[in-house]
Amino acid sequence: MSGSVSRDAEALKSADSSTRRSGGRITFPFMIVTLFGLTLATLGWLQNLIVYLIEEYNMKSIAAAKILNIFSGFTFMFPAIGAIAADSFFGTIPVILVSSFISLVGVVLLALTTLFDSLRPQACETASKLCQAPTNIQLGVLYTAITLGCVGAGGLRFTLATAGANQYEKTKDQGSFFNWFFFTWYLAASISATAIVYAEENISWSFGFGLCVAANLLGLIVFISGKKFYKHDKPLGSPFTSLLRVIFAAIRKRKAVVSTNEKDYHSESKKTPTKSFRFFNRAALKQDDEVNSDGTIHNQWRLCSVQQVEDFKAVIRIIPLVLAILFLSTPIAMQLGLTVLQGLVMDRRLGPHFKIPAGSLQVITLLSTCLFIIVNDRFLYPFYQKLTGKFPTPIQRVGIGHVFNILSMAVTAIVEAKRLKIVQKGHFLGSSSVADMSVLWLFPPLVIVGIGEAFHFPGNVALCYQEFPESMRSTATSITSVLIGICFYTSTALIDLIQKTTAWLPDDINHGRVDNVYWILVIGGVLNLGYFLVCSWFYKYRNLENADHEQDANVSH
């Protein structure tokens, strides 16, 4: 898989990234162990948060699912802030160090809520109407802990990938690190969703969260231990600044006449701006006293280069395609929470002595994604290339991901309809509200959504790296992450809307129609796929001339 990410890894490389000779392979174990520990710590509590809120804070199931979506969205959106802070002000190493410490404080505070009874409401039977609600102080401590944990995790997630790749000079070595980065992330995610979640539910919450504290502390100590070996990159300024300059400069010159003469534009390559979005060509239009005698720009907020204008146009062109990610990931975000709720009211026994934790169900998706990323890179894509002579484009891969996503929601709807029929017939396990239906029925849709993610997530990241301006490639991954984060908020808003307009999502889903919710997602997915196909039909690749040489630039996640 090393060759499949070479171009994307090179996008992470920063020119003149070090003021001294350092970095190299000696930094590899420090970076990887840091990633493993911090990922294990964060996902160890985040993946089982719904169950913790229901069992220990007496929250209703739907409310707990919405809280998970809110904080998961925050975790995905914060990497953009971390990336901007690293690029513009501090560099990657300090941002990772501070983020790791913030994450540790959050996890420690969360662990304290399991040790002190005063930080939790009085325990009662789950789903009882007499349960005591948490006080404002208890919620304040809880939300502070979760927020700190999310800020820390978000600040280091993709910044650590950039810092790790910047330790190497050769593109091949950077590609190798990038592969190990994503492999380690998925490995840690799988372990946290199984071992740590199992410890939380079968030993104690304090023991499980204690493991998260230990993992975070290990990651922080290892990262500090390797600090003297790291290559420290220089802050190069925010890549978004030049985009804002184009807007301001074009508005200031809105009355100027657009010229077709290349001499009227500020360009180092002696070219004129393209005809599309001609209004913004004014930003590169030279006027009196805007260029100094040495060729430099007097005021960068009044005059931009042609390249800056074209970079801005590239962002505008790709926005419609990228927006399709919003509804592509929204059903996945909803499925993430609803699947846990479904698992809680299904037979999770696997043999006489083992019970699958509801919070561990998502590991099926993680493992499915891991497996099919390898299948795609090693078998499917090369086979397609032999048949057609071309490698699948990022847009084609994203389109396939759309189809699998829709299929997963449809299968989940069918499974839930079957479960509700069993509930209506009164087939429960003993006197509980758990339907006499194995949770293994949820495995097929979770596998299918994982297959879809193996197509669309790497495809979206590859599309951003290829088509976003070169100055933005180091933060392209965080942009994708922000959109996924927004999806968690849109999923929460959609749940609110469904609750207000229907009776499909009561706190006890045995009396609801979660299957109808999934069918709504299927309809929305089909409409979104149609929108995506229309956008892709009109879209022209910015770097099409290099496609034949870089078709194997498939980002693995």
Curated annotation (Swiss-Prot):
Q: In which tissues is it expressed?
A: Expressed in roots.
TM helices/strands, residue ranges: 26-46, 67-87, 89-109, 136-156, 177-197, 203-223, 318-338, 356-376, 398-418, 439-459, 478-498, 518-538
GO process terms (BP): nitrate assimilation
- Please list the GO terms describing molecular function: transmembrane transporter activity
- List the membrane topology term(s): Multi-pass membrane protein
**Protein location:** Membrane
From which domain of life does this come?
Answer: Eukaryota
Main subcellular localization, coarse class? membrane
The record's keywords, sorted A to Z, are: Membrane, Nitrate assimilation, Transmembrane, Transmembrane helix, Transport
Q: Does the keyword Phosphoprotein apply?
A: no
GO cellular component terms listed in the entry, alphabetical order: membrane
Q: Which family does it belong to?
A: Belongs to the major facilitator superfamily. Proton-dependent oligopeptide transporter (POT/PTR) (TC 2.A.17) family.
The UniProt entry, under PANTHER family, shows: OLIGOPEPTIDE TRANSPORTER-RELATED
Q: What the protein does?
A: Transporter involved in a passive nitrate efflux.
Q: What is this protein called?
A: Protein NRT1/ PTR FAMILY 2.6
- Say which species the protein is native to: Arabidopsis thaliana
Gene this protein is translated from: NPF2.6
